[in-house]
Design a protein with these regions (language model features):
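Cap/lid segment of the alpha/beta-hydrolase catalytic domain
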Residues: 1-94, 137-143
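Alpha/beta-hydrolase fold nucleophile elbow
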Residues: 97-109
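Loop/turn elements at helix/coil->beta-strand transitions in domains of secreted/extracellular proteins
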Residues: 23-29, 99-102, 123-127, 188-192, ...
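Active-site loop->helix "elbow" adjoining a glycine-rich segment at hydrolase catalytic centers
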Residues: 77, 109-112
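Conserved strand-to-loop "acid loop" that flanks and positions the catalytic carboxylate
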Residues: 188-205, 249-252
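Mobile cap/lid helix-loop segments that gate and shape the active-site cleft of serine hydrolases
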Residues: 87, 94, 130-183, 204, ...
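C-terminal catalytic histidine-bearing segment of alpha/beta-hydrolase fold enzymes
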Residues: 157, 213-272
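Short glycine-enriched nucleophile-adjacent loop
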Residues: 85, 112-123, 128
Length: 272
């Protein structure tokens, strides 16, 4: 899942460094998330559904696949985008030369939340990489992380992302009956990578790291190592030994060549 400017490839960008991926022996595929669900709030979408290809009256095309009336627990845009990632994988399974048993799903920010959910719901993804995914992604809700976003902020700023029932936890992050390490643990025993940035206070880097740590017992159940902390928690000291990887990059809220390089290092180690 990528931004439009990165899909058209009119200029090189670290956000989607295709040249470096190819140089290292990896294929690259991307889809535009807003082709599946618009990334903005609109009363019609809130009441009737989020997955659209066409403009009103929404009577045919892709929209015809979805219920006309949303319930409190109907899925939001994050789930639609994750569903889209699985449809990309469907196609990759038909492409000669692509080993569909070794496909990673990678996302940044809201895309990181999407990647986690795609990995949790589709076990065909061999590696799940969530970059700067923050609240409702890889950041724990039950731990206070200074300046990090909250459930209320996510629901108020992006009410189309999740089901409406989730709003009952606005201002109640600490009483949510589960936490994000449960979501991360659903990837086990496959490969998981959580990435943070030191200057990305909103995503709560420490809370993201704790999710990697506290999800790891799920890998132990399979007789495998989760996060192996073979060094100090500090900037640009990646943890790659276990099947849960982590790094803290210097800088702000972005997906950079450093992040991609560490993802590929991890894949080289565990998927080659």
């Amino acid at each position: 899942m990528a931004r439009f400017a990165d899909i058209d490839r009119k200029r090189r960008t670290e956000f989607f460094p295709v040249e470096e991926m190819l140089r290292r022996g990896y294929a690259a595929a991307v889809f535009k998330n807003t082709d599946l669900a618009k990334d903005d709030y609109h009363p019609y979408f809130s009441a009737n559904g989020v997955a659209v290809i066409q403009d009103p009256p929404f009577t045919n095309g892709f929209y015809a696949c979805w219920a006309k009336e949303r319930t409190e627990t109907s899925w939001g845009a994050i789930s639609v985008w994750a569903w889209g990632a699985s449809r990309v994988l469907d196609w990759l399974e038909t492409v000669p030369g692509i080993d569909s048993r070794r496909v990673a799903v990678v996302g940044h920010s809201r895309g990181g939340k999407t990647a986690l959910w795609a990995g949790a719901t589709d076990r065909r993804f061999a590696l799940v990489c969530a970059n700067d995914s923050g609240c409702c992604g890889a950041k724990l809700n039950h731990v206070a992380v200074s300046m990090s976003e909250t459930i209320r902020q996510d629901n108020n700023n992006n009410p189309h992302w999740f089901c409406r029932a989730f709003r009952q936890f606005n201002g109640r992050d600490f009483v949510l009956p589960y936490d994000q390490h449960w979501l991360a643990a659903l990837v086990a025993p496959r490969l998981l990578y959580i990435a943070s940035a030191s200057g990305d206070a909103g995503a709560g880097p420490w809370g993201e790291f704790l999710t990697a740590r506290h999800a790891s017992p799920a890998w132990t159940l399979y007789g495998k190592d989760g996060l192996v902390e073979d060094g100090p928690y500090r900037i640009e000291v990646p943890f790659h030994v276990g099947r849960v990887g982590y790094h803290l990059r210097k800088g702000g809220h972005d997906l950079t060549l450093y992040d991609w390089s560490r993802f590929m290092d991890f894949a080289d180690r565990h998927l080659r």
